[in-house]
Amino acid sequence: LAWVWLPQAQPLSSQRISEQLAVVDQSLMDRYFKRRHDRLLKARQKVSAADIPQFLALDSTSISTYSETIASAAYGHARQDPHLRQVNLSLGVDYETGDVCYAYESEGSTNDKQLYLAIVQRMIDHQFDLSNTVLVTDRGYHSLMNMQKLINLELKFVQGVTRAEDSVRRLFDQHRVSLDDPAFTDGRLEVAA
């Protein structure tokens, strides 16, 4: 697809890519994505009279590298190529538009649970308006500490949890009838309340 959108563009060498990445630091990325996020919220307000929250899906991936110049590359928990160092890339994506609203690059040995609060705190520190945003994560980000911090910050969130936790399993069993009742289902979001 690159030749369709950028017909005159030539692929960059790995050396040139490393040089370009060396001048982009996280604070530049934070400022850039703050502007993107603000633009998206303004566009949402113009289109929707209702105060519908933004759903911001957060997820991370590890990228393996042979590079010796990437400072944040570290040995992590790679399933593929465990002999290579890796870098974590976390993205915040607007559910409705698919726009990337935030990106965070971190050391490859950091797991999602540790990363979650760092990402949220960076967004808060850079004045991201999260007042009408629901943060959505998978179970890899779940910990009681993370949940309590989000509650303390008065942030809205949906977080996957492993059913292996006895307390969660008991709650599912206790409320099974209500969860299966169509009256408690939001058809638009396809979730049970």
Predicted features and spans:
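Conserved, well-structured functional cores that handle cations and Mg-NTP chemistry
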Residues: 1-193
